[in-house]
Amino acid sequence: EKRPFFLEGQEIFTTSPRANPGFRSSGTPTTLINTRRIGAPPRALTDTSIELAQTEANQPSELIAATKITGQTGSLRYGLLVALEDDTELIGLKDGNTVRQTQLGRDFTAARVLYENTQGSGRNAVGLLLTEVGHQDQTAQTLGIDLHHLSQSGKLIVDVQTLHSDTAIESGHGAFADIVFRPQQGVQHKLTLDYFDRNLDISDFGFLQRNDVKGYRYRFERVQSDLKRLKGRETDLVVTQQWNFAGEQTRLGFSGAQELRFFDNTQLELKLDFYPKRWEDRNSDGNGSYRLQDRFQTAINYSSDSAKPFSYRLRANMRQEDIGGQNRSMSLALSYQPTDRLSTSFDFKYETRSGWLLHNAGSEFTRFHSESLRPKLEV
């Protein structure tokens, strides 16, 4: 989101750290409010016989008005967001003839209250968030309750949130928890728990990577500095496991990474991942699940001192494909900045894939072999 109106005062509507995962996180946001939905392309037409060009169907919706109210009374904070979209006129083809169809705009509403107790050096908070997206075709409502705890020592952080969705068709429920424990400086344990049933749908206003999932993710991080032969070292170990509600194990992975920082400000990063056999239940677009083989992935990255006028970065990656074959890539990035006003970068990537599995239609898949060379120059 880059629109100033929706960025200013948005903190009150942030219900958990997952709403903004950050640059170090590989996950996607989980949030009841994604303001980029406001002004997004209009809903699909109910008359499916009208053919729309992609540029026509994906044009943004204009806003009629939007207002935001935020404030605080003692330990109670509150916020209200309302945005109204204008109707969109779409031009398409029906039976070979040009037709015009008007799609009504949506009405977005979000109401938030948060009670915080920050006495001492810790924090305890409980919040409530209600959202509604109104449209002639369907009204979608969501409800979220969030709980937060920060111990006085700062070693324990707990964030819990429940999610509920309700439309005219179905209602869904879910919850997640993030638990962070830092027993000492430079050491962190993080456990995340997920439970999203098959009917949970918050996509009208929010964002959820997928529903029909339950599982956990454990991550160990250790940061060391001022070592005898290194300027710093970071170590990450991750274990992930997920199931769908049919009982199929849809995700299982063991990952390890280490970043070494040398005294000359160069960096070396090593990664190794192992993904045991599991079920893939999404790529077939609702046409069933299929079994993936054991797979390995490894990567090596080396970076020179980026503070110098000339710097470079080398990357090499090897990953096994879903049911056999390999993906191999090598890249080189060069950067030259003689002054603050002039900078030049050149990126070069070479990639080969064998056994690249893609879904065609129904239960049919096809494996491809590919080779690509992608140079990029920026001044």
Give residue spans per PLM region.
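Surface-exposed, low-hydrophobicity segments enriched in Gly/Pro/acidic/Ser residues
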Residues: 1-242, 365-379
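Exposed, low-structure sequence patches enriched in small/polar residues
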Residues: 62, 160-379
